[in-house]
Amino acid sequence: MASPNSAEPLLSFKNVRAGYGEAIVLDDISFEMPERGSIAVLGRNGVGKSTLLLTLMGFTQLRRGSIIWRGTDITRLAPHRRAQSGIGWVAQEREIFANLTVEENLTVAARPGRWDLDAAFDFFPRLKERRQSKGNQLSGGEQQMLATARALMTNPALLLLDEPLEGLAPIIVEELVRGLRKMITEEGTAVILVEQHAEVALSLTENAVLLERGAIVHHARSADLLKDHATLDRYIGLRVADGKPAQA
Amino acid sequence: MTPTDPATAAPAPTAPHPHMAAQVRWRTVEYVFWLATLLPFVVAPDYLALASQIAITALFALSLDLILGYAGIVSLGHAAFFGFGAYAAGLVSKWGWGEPLSGLLIAGLAAGLLGYLMSFVIARFRHLALIMITLGFGLLLLEAANSASGLTGGADGLQGVKMWPVLGLFKFDLYGFTAYWYALIVLFVFFLMARRLINSPFGLSLRGIRENPVRMRAIGAESGPHIRKIYTIAAFMAGVAGAVLTQTTETVSLGVLDFQRSADILVILILGGAGRLYGGLIGAIIYMIARDWFSGVNPQYWYFPIGVLLIAVVLFLPNGMLGGIAQLIDTVRGRRWFGWLTSPPPWLRSGSKP
């Protein structure tokens, strides 16, 4: 993949095959990303986008291949070690600690680094206003912000975002996208972004991969893919200008 | 490639977070509570034996609260550690060492060691499986104590426990005067320890594990070691509680290991409010006094009103007495019902933004 940095990649997947129990979901996945890179992972439902992130965190069974993180093989590393080594994961289900306050949800994840409580509150001012509220008293958008902020509190070198915009009101989407853009472009946080909103995801990231039935079928620069309506249409059935129905 | 080295860029993780520091501060109601524990000396000197039983039960409930209320480890066999500590303290004394404080320590360590061994099994399971395992473990220990009658005295109880005076000065008297202040001080010391523990980052991690262990792993805290640690600590505390019972009554019966005791302590904790520091303490006070009173009123069917009390609490105060009180305070302060009228929540405000 085009990378301005020829040094050691931040992360690379080498021929990874993974799944749950007997079921194989991902097969022969290979890609790499540089420090401060950003990748959008696109594809229809059920092609293995979330599984890709779960595999990176160590929550699936990895059958073949390896995952290299900053030059170290983490293929067999326990999930909490991966988190400690700088991978932060925001799950699709958000998984807020329902009975902890916003502040406790954040401090429980705190690890030394640039992101502390104040930085997180600066980033999501709304969370500061609700700092004493319990996790289960938050709206969906606030929960998403909290999940993102909580991952940031671990001061990750790489942030995994699983459909962060799902089910949010447009105004909240706007706010969150603004935050993510700042994080990715200005602050250079490395991000893998799984998202159904292809256009938003592509506008935020540098590179993109398209998944189809557990395999990577297309690699591109996000800016190029954004214009490549034919490919988008074929793999995600995005209704673009030419109005062709999605191919089965 | 990162612009700043994370290790040097921020304050040390050990610096206390302000909101954690705020929780550590003592509230007035806490001072009142602990001063009130001295009342029995003045108000009810005839009931000091009961008061010491309450203090022991409170310590036992506090130990269960650490694992159940804070770490979410269900246990139906917590009496195993209480009983193990009770027998350990009894045997130490029977074998010729009647010094109470070192006896407490030995009993605590023995129970803690048992808890540590057990914790490797506990950390692997959750929910229903835990109920079965702890239940089975408790029954096993009870039968072991029953059949090892040469050591434990079996169904006749352990005879020949003789305690020396506390610090060589204060003899355990018939009225329970020494027993109560002794039990109370032990309770207070362990309460301070528990309070410190749960207001630490470790305590917060435990609550995270209770809420969602997978998520805790994903933010870098493996639940296994945390659970093993707190389980060992709780077993130590339960053992000490058992030891205090042995030392203040100078006898040990099989009842200390009974399933009934495990069930009672669970009821007490739920009654008071699990996951709250004072839940077990309040629960112990209410339950023990109610039991004493009901059994005086009607010696035959005294469990009936206890059952009514339990059902009422679970129906109307699902978070226990303390949970109910907290809710009441919220309501009175208007936070819950009327607060949003005076200060609209942020989502309303930003929704009206152009």
Over which residues does each language-model region extend?
Chain A
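Conserved ABC ATPase signature
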Residues: 134-138, 142
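The feature captures the beta-strand-to-loop junction immediately N-terminal to the Walker
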Residues: 42-44
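Conserved ABC transporter NBD signature motif
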Residues: 65-73, 85, 115, 119-122
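Helix-to-loop junction immediately C-terminal to a conserved catalytic motif
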Residues: 57
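Helical segment within the ABC ATPase nucleotide-binding domain
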Residues: 174-187
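ABC ATPase C-loop
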Residues: 151-152
